[in-house]
């Protein structure tokens, strides 16, 4: 079962060391763990409840609605992954995000805590309500555990100085 962490208040979003913008309403982080149920004869076999469960890792989905941003800066997120700035163009099929170094660091600088994900990529980057007075830019990131088998770090959370 997934769980969510809500960051209330202002959050500055930095991706690949570039400040993408500011979210006055905070961001949400959804942690999704992966499990494998282990069956055993003494607990009913395949039809019974698991005798144990094995943790297989976790990913985080981060959603930020930027209310203050430079459009040119956030549009560059698409070109980071070979999208280019041409609408409708997608990466080459078969592109491996981690193996081809397309994953970057994501940092959420909040009023109380700074959260860092070392391995993240953009899932969605869309401007909403363009052309009207109130508009925002929605960024959705997917974050994976660090590619260091000894550490298995998904994110670090430290008090904001």
Task: Label every model-predicted segment.
Residues 1-74, 114-136:
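Solvent-exposed edge beta-strands and adjacent loop segments
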Residues 18, 80, 109-111, 160:
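Low-complexity, intrinsically disordered/propeptide-like segments
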Residues 33, 110, 145-147:
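Residues on the solvent-exposed faces and adjacent turns
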Residues 61-65, 105-107, 138-142:
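Beta-strand secondary-structure signal
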Residues 65, 87, 91, 142-144:
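Residue-level recognition of well-ordered secondary-structure positions
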Residues 88-129:
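Acidic-leaning, charged glycine-interspersed low-complexity segments
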Residues 117-161:
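Short, charged interaction patches at domain edges and termini
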């Amino acid at each position: 079962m997934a769980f969510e962490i809500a960051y209330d208040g202002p959050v500055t979003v930095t991706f690949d060391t570039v400040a993408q913008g500011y979210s006055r309403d905070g961001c949400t982080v959804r942690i999704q763990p992966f499990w494998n149920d282990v069956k055993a004869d003494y607990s009913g076999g395949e039809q019974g409840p698991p005798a144990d469960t094995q943790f297989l890792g976790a990913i985080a989905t981060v959603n930020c609605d930027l209310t203050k941003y430079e459009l040119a800066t956030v549009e560059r997120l698409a070109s980071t992954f070979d999208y280019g700035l041409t609408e409708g163009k997608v990466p080459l099929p078969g592109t491996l995000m981690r193996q081809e170094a397309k994953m970057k660091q994501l940092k959420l600088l909040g009023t109380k805590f700074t959260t860092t994900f070392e391995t993240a990529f953009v899932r969605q980057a869309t401007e909403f309500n363009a052309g009207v007075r109130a508009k925002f830019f929605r960024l959705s990131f997917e974050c994976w555990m660090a590619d260091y088998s000894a550490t298995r770090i998904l994110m670090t959370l430290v008090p904001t100085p």
